[in-house]
């Protein structure tokens, strides 16, 4: 009897967008896909598509903001399979209508984009250290390279996501664990569909997922794309701060 353990892959935010596309890419025989998402019906639909590809699938609507729930979810996967890959993909964006709502709005964004990353990644770390193997991917954003006034606090939360992944990469390398920061530009999704401003180099979701999968297979520390957007962000970062500040203040904001 084959005793080869299943390869456990955790993906948050898997009911749509990049998370859903990644789930389909990784689905296959010998894989235990553990998926979370906010929309139960879309999540179950994605789970069935992955099962049709031969994967064993666990799909739950546990919020990434639930510390204990995410800990149980991650450790439960590790009890059923070798924890090979954790992709902290869940994220939210948006805007606020009144300064009276500002505090609640900021905390709502950061609870998902910062606390959600910690609640997904941190329980996996000691498990992977004991295994002496595993890979962690944190989905940040191209917005995580500059402090963008029109994207408060989305930009700063993605700064954290990118920096946390890059710090962990160096710290966990001696433990045999690979870590990558994923920094996409504009990708077709329910989130970007709300944007009312031009989105240069808007990329198809399936193509973005393939770039991410290939970058993770190569153990790239920073998976940033598309390259024209990477070049633009790099050039902006070289500007004197007063000029950069002037330009970023005129960038469109999120609604």
Residue ranges of predicted features:
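Conserved mid-core segment of classical short-chain dehydrogenase/reductases
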Residues: 82, 93-107, 150
């Amino acid at each position: 009897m084959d005793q080869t353990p299943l390869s456990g892959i955790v993906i948050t935010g898997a009911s749509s967008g990049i998370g859903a596309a990644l789930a389909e890419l990784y689905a296959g025989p010998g894989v235990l896909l553990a998926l979370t998402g906010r929309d139960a019906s879309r999540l179950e639909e994605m789970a069935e598509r992955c099962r049709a590809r031969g994967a064993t699938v666990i799909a739950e609507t546990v919020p990434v903001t639930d510390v204990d729930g995410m800990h149980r979810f991650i450790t439960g996967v590790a009890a059923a399979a070798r924890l090979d890959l954790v992709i902290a993909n869940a994220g939210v964006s948006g805007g606020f209508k009144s300064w009276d709502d500002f505090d609640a709005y900021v905390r709502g964004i950061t609870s998902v984009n910062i606390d959600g990353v910690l609640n997904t990644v941190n329980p996996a770390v000691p498990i992977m250290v004991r295994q002496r193997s595993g890979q962690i991917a944190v989905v940040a954003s191209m917005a995580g390279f500059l402090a963008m006034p029109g994207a408060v606090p989305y930009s700063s939360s993605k700064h954290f996501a990118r920096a946390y992944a890059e710090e962990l990469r160096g710290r966990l390398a001696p433990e045999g664990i690979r870590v990558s920061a994923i920094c996409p530009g504009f990708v077709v999704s329910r989130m970007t569909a709300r944007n009312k401003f031009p989105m240069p180099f808007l990329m198809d979701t399936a193509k973005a997922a393939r770039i991410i999968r290939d970058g993770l297979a190569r153990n790239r520390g920073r998976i940033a794309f598309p390259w024209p957007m990477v070049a633009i962000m790099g050039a902006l970062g070289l500007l004197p701060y007063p000029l950069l500040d002037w330009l970023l203040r005129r960038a469109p904001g999120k609604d």
